[in-house]
């Protein structure tokens, strides 16, 4: 069982275990030792987001890697999917990103990509964790460089997929994060009239009241300013949420439905959080629908298993496998707008084409996720909730892979909110009991 790597790399509060400079230095040494088993002279591309702790952790990770003879190429502030793309395009040994995605500024994280541009497989992360337990004396003096073409190369990749957006008025919520520079450049070059919001990072304002997890302000701006649509990215740019001209959230399930029809897909991979309405609508059109566990790495695994090319999550992580190896908010925005051009209409029209079942998602902060999830009384509570819905809805309770919370989701035509709140209270009570023991 992995101790440090979760569903999206190593995460935690910066400066506290495990994300201390000392630990990150050792992580760099262990990762460097692993990469030395893959190539004689490894090259690792290293990028970061805009958190105040990113510089410190970047320096520690780079030092650890270089102590093992690794060449480190600094990419500066760049969206996570840009690192994945460049790792593959430049045939680097690996890519690494200092970011905690949609989490608040106090948190940070480290994730690695392999030479194919995909996240490191579980076995590789397990081997790096094993190597963390060993001492790693200096095995050479690694060198460092600043790869100044990183943003331009990533921008060129994105523009190759961009439709002509001339005349489109777009609001961009950049979350004070990694897309704050490249986002406006991209949409302006594609011809759109751009209004950028939340694009002045100060190290502490990333995701604060903005971005894909807080699109309310963008929704208001779109309506008040008469924009055609809004795009809300998260802190590292691997997801996007859309706002239609009426200020409504056009989320990942809508995107999957629209893209599947526009691009002639044979089926779609969603997750256990995907709305039942998406599954029903796709099957009515003869398209397959498969559910994966939550997390883009599991969506990718299911895509490979089923041979499909389109998958994603309601949160805005969408993988267009013919074009990229990972979720990419900027690419998703471009391809969704291309799908609209192909089918006609705007986001508001397609929002109404897929009426979603009411869904309530509550996050319950807990002291010990594993203990609460293992409590048999939680299983009983879930079964009781399902019985109350009488087969006319779904219940899903799962631990977050990146935060100390358990997510309670209830989806039903009726009673969703009431059942979700009751179940969340049961989870909270079990957590308090576990903490008292």
Curated annotation (Swiss-Prot):
It catalyses: alpha-D-glucosamine 1-phosphate = D-glucosamine 6-phosphate. Mg(2+) binds at residues 101, 234, 236, 238. The active site is at residue 101. GO terms for cellular component: cytosol. The modification Phosphoserine is found at residue 101. The keyword Phosphoprotein applies. InterPro entries: A-D-PHexomutase_a/b/a-I (IPR005844), A-D-PHexomutase_a/b/a-I/II/III (IPR016055), A-D-PHexomutase_a/b/a-II (IPR005845), A-D-PHexomutase_a/b/a-III (IPR005846), A-D-PHexomutase_C (IPR005843), A-D-PHexomutase_C_sf (IPR036900), Alpha-D-phosphohexomutase_SF (IPR005841), GlmM_bact (IPR006352). Keywords: Isomerase, Magnesium, Metal-binding, Phosphoprotein. The keyword Magnesium applies. Its cofactor is Mg(2+). Activated by phosphorylation. Its EC number is 5.4.2.10. GO terms for molecular function: magnesium ion binding; phosphoglucosamine mutase activity; phosphomannomutase activity. Pfam families: PGM_PMM_I, PGM_PMM_II, PGM_PMM_III, PGM_PMM_IV. Signal peptide: none annotated. GO terms for biological process: carbohydrate metabolic process; peptidoglycan biosynthetic process; UDP-N-acetylglucosamine biosynthetic process. Binds 1 Mg(2+) ion per subunit. It comes from the Bacteria. Catalyzes the conversion of glucosamine-6-phosphate to glucosamine-1-phosphate. NCBIfam families: glmM, PRK10887.1. HAMAP family: GlmM_B. Belongs to the phosphohexose mutase family. This is Phosphoglucosamine mutase.
């Amino acid at each position: 069982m992995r101790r440090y790597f979760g569903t999206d790399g190593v995460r935690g509060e910066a400066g506290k275990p495990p994300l201390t400079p000392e630990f990150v230095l050792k992580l760099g040494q262990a990762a460097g030792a692993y990469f030395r088993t893959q190539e004689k002279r490894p090259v690792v591309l290293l990028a970061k987001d805009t958190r105040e702790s990113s510089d410190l952790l970047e320096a520690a990770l780079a030092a650890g890697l270089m102590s093992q003879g690794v060449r480190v190429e600094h990419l500066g502030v760049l969206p996570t999917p840009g690192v994945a793309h460049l790792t593959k395009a430049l045939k680097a040994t690996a890519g690494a990103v200092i970011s905690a995605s949609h989490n608040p500024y106090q948190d940070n994280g480290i994730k690695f990509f392999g030479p194919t541009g995909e996240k490191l497989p579980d076995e590789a992360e397990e081997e790096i964790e094993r190597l963390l337990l060993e001492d790693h004396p200096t095995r050479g003096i690694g060198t460092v460089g600043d790869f100044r073409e990183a943003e331009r190369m990533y921008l060129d990749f994105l523009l190759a997929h961009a439709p002509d957006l001339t005349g489109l008025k777009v609001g961009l919520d950049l979350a004070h994060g990694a897309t704050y520079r490249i986002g406006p450049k991209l949409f302006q070059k594609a011809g759109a009239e751009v209004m950028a919001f939340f694009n002045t990072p100060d190290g502490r304002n990333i995701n604060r009241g903005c971005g894909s997890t807080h699109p309310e302000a963008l929704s208001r701006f779109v309506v008040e300013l008469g924009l055609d649509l809004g795009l809300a990215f998260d802190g590292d740019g691997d997801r996007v949420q859309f706002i239609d001209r009426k200020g409504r959230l056009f989320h990942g399930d809508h995107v999957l439905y629209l893209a599947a029809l526009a691009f002639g897909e044979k089926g779609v991979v969603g997750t256990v959080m995907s709305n039942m309405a998406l599954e029903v609508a796709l099957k009515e059109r003869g398209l397959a629908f498969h559910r994966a566990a939550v997390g883009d790495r599991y969506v990718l695994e299911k895509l490979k298993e089923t041979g499909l090319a389109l998958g994603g999550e309601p949160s805005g992580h969408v993988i267009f496998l013919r074009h990229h190896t990972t979720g990419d908010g900027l690419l998703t925005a471009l391809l969704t707008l291309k799908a609209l051009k192909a089918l006609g209409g705007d986001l508001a029209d397609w929002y109404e084409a897929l009426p979603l079942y009411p869904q309530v998602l509550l996050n319950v902060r807990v002291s010990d996720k594993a203990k609460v999830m293992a409590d048999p009384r939680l299983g009983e509570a879930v079964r009781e909730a399902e019985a109350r819905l009488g087969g006319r809805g779904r219940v899903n309770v799962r631990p977050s892979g990146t935060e100390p919370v358990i997510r309670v989701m209830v989806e039903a035509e009726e009673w969703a909110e009431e059942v979700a709140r009751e179940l969340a209270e049961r989870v909270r009570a079990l957590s308090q009991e576990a903490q008292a023991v």
